[in-house]
C-alpha cells in the first residue's frame, strides 16, 4: 500500500518499574485502538520480544511544537489559534467517549505539526479513563508547569477540566515563548509579554 509506519520501542530495564511500564503501555494501546480522529495516530499492532515492546503505528511526518518553539521562539497568534482549535476538537472527542478519556499531559512536546498544518496528539502513556465515583487518580501524572493542581495528588480525580488547564498552559507557552515548565513556573497575562496579542485570547487562557 506504500504507506509508512512508525515503530515505537519501549525497553524494560532494571531501572524501570516493569509492571508500571507494561501497565502504561497497555493503557496507551487499549485507548488508541478504540479511537478514530484525524488528530490522533492509529495503532496497528504490538509485539513483545526480549524484554522490549514494539508498537506499530501511523507514521506522523513533521515536528513537535516543542522543537519548533525551541528553535524559533513564540509562534504567530494566528497559527496558535488554529492549533488550539484543532486541539479543542480532539479533546472534545476524547472527553465525549464512554467513559471519557482524560489525556493528562498536553504540552508542546506531545503535539506533532504535519507539513499540511494538521496537528496530531501523540503519546497516550499517561491517559486514563474517567471513573465515576473515584475520589482521586490512582497515580498522579503530568508535567510541572502545565499540570493542573489536582494532578499533584490529593485534590480530586482528573477530568476534562484538567486537560483544559493543560491546554491553556500550552497555548500560553506557544504564543509567548515563555515556558511554564521552567522557573518561576508561572503563567502571566499574555499581553504583559506582548501588548499586540488579542485581549480575547488572553481572556480565554
Per-region residue spans from a language model:
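AlphaC helix of the eukaryotic protein kinase fold
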Residues: 14-34
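Protein kinase catalytic-loop region centered on the HRD/HxD motif
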Residues: 89-101
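Activation-segment/catalytic-loop signature of the eukaryotic protein kinase fold
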Residues: 46
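C-terminal lobe helix-coil module of Hanks-type protein kinase domains
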Residues: 145-205
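Conserved short submotifs of the Hanks-type protein kinase catalytic core
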Residues: 50-64
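AlphaC helix of the protein kinase catalytic domain
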Residues: 65-75
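Activation segment signature within eukaryotic-like protein kinase domains
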Residues: 83-84
